[in-house]
Amino acid sequence: MCRIHQDCCCDFHHDPSCFSEIMMSFRQNQMANRPTIHDVARVAGVSTATVDRVLNGREKVREETARKVYEAARLIGYHAAPLIGQRMQADLPRLRLGLVLHKERQAFYQAFKAEAERAVMQATGVRASLQVVFASSQSPRDFTELMEGMAGRVDAIAATAVTHPDVTEAVVRLNAKGIPCFALLNDFAQGVRQNYIGLNNLKVGRIAAHMIATAAHHAGKIAVFVGGYRWHGHELRETGVRSYFREHAPQFQVLDTLINLETRQLTYEATLDLLGRHPDLRGIYCAGGGMEGAIAALREARQPGEVALVVNELTPESRSALIDRHVTMVIATPLPRLCTDLLTLAAEAVTGGIAGVQRQHFLQPDLYLPESV
């Protein structure tokens, strides 16, 4: 057991039992006493002199140590916690990040926004702030107006925009103003954007095809939905599906690709039509949005497992369909990793200048099966 006394310095990050005792002792006294600098020091596992240096900024303190002090101060309600936070931020470079998403009411993009906000709150090494806006449609104009409208208010811009010459030209104009742009999920503006951050979409398509071929009990037909021809990522996923079946499962026939505009109603109607016209339909892959429509159609017309359905992104709808086995697998973007990496790369671009060589920053997808949720 850890003895608690006025001068105890216990690192709660590495000794949870000690932390529990400290917090128990603190709560027993918090009604009678305001938290003091000694309480902060004990919970943070540092000396009172270190807390004093963080508070008053007299001497430099390592960022990790200052963060421990700040976390401890917030945790126990120390009155000067906001001041400690300001001290920590004072000498850090500024990063104002603009984020342009779409489909505001979709669960996935709400989760995206929440993870981006969390990453900004937890960012170290920069004074990060975030502005998030949502495009009302897939129109290139909607994206370009929102992106260029952020000029002068942000230091870097990241977007899930469509692939279109107008978007590319907007990125060129933003670059000329010294604002680096990052393509998220869909690799738009290749050759002029700073980085692409997302999944390797060709591999994603091959993963989907592999699962469908494995789950299907008999040879037959395969359907692929894409959101539209302006989504480069969807086209790469479609290519991955076709290349896998061509190489490893030629007994399956991949039908002509269907456009669903990422809407559930179009996907629902098209899926019911496919099931009616192709009794030997063995698998469906939704390369973009609209998966809710395919799930609803299969629930109406097929028993679980009769048609292998692979979709993207774990949402309440796809999780539920995994549980009842109308979805065979979900291929998900690791949003926490994406947002953390975005902040790191954006900070590097803002402090180091726009790179002459653009890169792709691939993330490992998260794969979910019925037994893993």
What are these regions, as identified by a protein language model?
Residues 1-30, 300:
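Short, intrinsically disordered or compositionally biased N-terminal tails of bacterial proteins
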Residues 16-85:
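N-terminal helix-turn-helix DNA-binding module of bacterial transcription factors
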Residues 80-145:
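Amphipathic helical "hinge" segments at domain boundaries
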Residues 102-108, 131-142, 163, 186, ...:
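Hinge/beta->alpha junction and helix N-cap segments in small-molecule ligand-binding domains
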Residues 156-175, 241, 256-317:
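Hydrophobic alpha-helical
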Residues 166-203, 315-323:
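Flexible loop/hinge segments that line or gate small-molecule binding clefts
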Residues 204-222:
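A conserved helix-loop-strand patch within extracytoplasmic ligand-binding domains
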Residues 245, 334-373:
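Hinge/cleft segment of the Venus flytrap/periplasmic-binding protein
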